[in-house]
């Protein structure tokens, strides 16, 4: 029994040690667009950013399934209720849920396998503004960008007010949505991939689209880099 207690205590101390060593991150979200955006983050909320303004968020260690995006064409009242043309999150300035397509996404998970952060830019929900997602500390230097003018080049059938839809949003078929978990690239995903090779162009585009940095790295997300 004493041996079991010792092992249990050791396990708890080890878990506590790992938890103590894991550090969250600081994200500097910057608007370089020549127009106002309403930055959104889950977790984090939301903030209006005029050109040149920034917003700092501090997600905790172990945060996963998180994303940052820009909303455009928004109007909010004094209570923070309104609507956005792209990226709207249930009509709230302070987002509590993911945004409506089309919107360019910065996605991340902190302190995961081997205490690595995983991050990506995704066009699986379409595109609304150009984006950079880059580490700013920790000796990690590989940043990623999607800077093509996709809205102007968007195929007619994918066009939306203020953005360019992913085909899943428009056609809602397994070929494009990958509901079965078994799908490959399509002509539409190649359209996105050739213009933004660092970004996810369809749900299974993992091999060339997921990047890592050591846990505790800080990052910047730039709209219109």
Curated annotation (Swiss-Prot):
GO cellular component, one term: extracellular region
Signal peptide from the UniProt entry: 1-24
Major location (coarse): secreted
PTMs per UniProt: N-glycosylated.
GO annotation (BP), single: killing of cells of another organism
Matching Pfam families: Thaumatin
Disulfide bonds: 33-224, 74-84, 89-95, 140-213, 146-196, 154-164, 168-177, 178-183
Keywords: Allergen, Antimicrobial, Disulfide bond, Fungicide, Glycoprotein, Pathogenesis-related protein, Plant defense, Secreted, Signal
Localisation per UniProt entry: Secreted
Role according to the record: Has antifungal activity against B.cinerea, C.comatus, M.arachidicola, P.piricola, C.albicans and S.carlsbergensis. Inhibits HIV-1 reverse transcriptase.
Family label: Belongs to the thaumatin family.
Entry protein name: Thaumatin-like protein
Organism from which the protein derives: Actinidia chinensis var. chinensis
């Amino acid at each position: 029994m004493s041996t079991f207690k010792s092992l249990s205590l050791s396990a708890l101390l080890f878990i506590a040690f790992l938890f103590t060593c894991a550090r969250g991150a600081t994200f500097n979200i910057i608007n370089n667009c020549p127009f106002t955006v309403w930055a959104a983050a889950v977790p984090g909320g939301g903030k209006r950013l005029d050109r040149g303004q920034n917003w700092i968020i501090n997600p905790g260690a172990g945060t996963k399934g998180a994303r940052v995006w820009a909303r455009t064409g928004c109007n909010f009242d004094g209570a923070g209720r309104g609507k956005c043309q792209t990226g709207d999150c249930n009509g709230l300035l302070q987002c509590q849920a993911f945004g409506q397509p089309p919107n360019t996404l910065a996605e991340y998970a902190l302190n995961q396998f081997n205490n690595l952060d995983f991050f990506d830019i995704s066009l699986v929900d379409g595109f609304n503004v150009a984006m950079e997602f880059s580490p700013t500390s920790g000796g990690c230097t590989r940043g990623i960008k999607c800077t093509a003018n996709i809205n102007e080049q968007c195929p007619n059938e994918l066009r939306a007010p203020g953005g360019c839809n992913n085909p899943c949003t428009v056609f809602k078929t397994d070929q494009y949505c990958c509901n079965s978990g078994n799908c490959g690239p399509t002509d539409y995903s190649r359209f996105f991939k050739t213009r933004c090779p660092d970004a996810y162009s369809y749900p299974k585009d993992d091999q060339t689209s997921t990047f890592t940095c050591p846990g505790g790295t800080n990052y910047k997300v730039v709209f219109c880099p």
